[in-house]
Amino acid sequence: MERKVLAFYYTWYGVPQVSGNWYHWEEGGHSPNDVNENGYPDFGTTNHPSHGPYDSNDPHAIRRHLKWSEEAGIDGLIATWWGQGQYHDKALKIVLNEAEKSPVKITVYYEVVPSSGVSGAVDDFKYLLKNYGKHPGFYTVDNRPVIFVYGRAMEQLNRDQWAEAMKQVKAEYDAVFIADTGSAELICLFDGGHTYNPVGLVANQVDMSQYYDDFTKKCRSVDKIACATVIPGYDDSNIGRKHVTMANRRGGELYKSLWAKAEKSAPDWMLITSFNEWHEGSEIEPSIEDGKLYLTLTRQLASKFKQR
């Protein structure tokens, strides 16, 4: 399988000039119209975007993100998705239309199962595949649309329910599903496995070389796509969480170290958490604090990974 690099992408941002309100920049009770003690707008972020706050429905911002992703050697962006007709669903349409003109394509991160359970998940997947699966901007493998499923959603259904959901969807659509789970019993129901965020492992000083190796072997043991996830750093201390988690970026050293360890496990795809999850300080999108450092590092590391 051809090696690919994808990054988790958030389409939940809004500014008054475009969407009429602030969306997500005020996360954690912040006030973007105010200035904080450091002289920056009071955003619910760890760092500050180099081009200022933006709106996920703004084609200009999307084009900038796609251009940066292309420069960094990223093949696809995994866009957060919370349900039919939601803010993120509207933004997805705009992002897909822009991705049609870019080599960087868009898939979705299925975040939550509706209260109706299996039938709701099946309905959501069919909605996504019917409305977006054939869009020229959608990310595919061998012409098969790809969907990632987040751990929260994974936990909302049991194994038998997921088996039934996959059976019903795949009877109608030839799609690829990548599950956020460490269970081989669950991975085998899907087309691959991944981890959204290894920050807990990093913070607890787990042997990441061993972790990546074990996870890749687990996916391969059931003949599925193996993904390895890297982070540039993490800091959710500015959004009012009771329990704060941090992983120091160390000027890019953490990122390079995780790439090297993940690469040794020979995964099929490398995933980056994240392109622009500003709340949790895991972004590689250019910031006032780091400039384009993480795009530059990603370009170097992605190129090396794809050449192995």
Where are these regions (language model features)?
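Glycan-processing catalytic domains of CAZymes
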Residues: 1-308
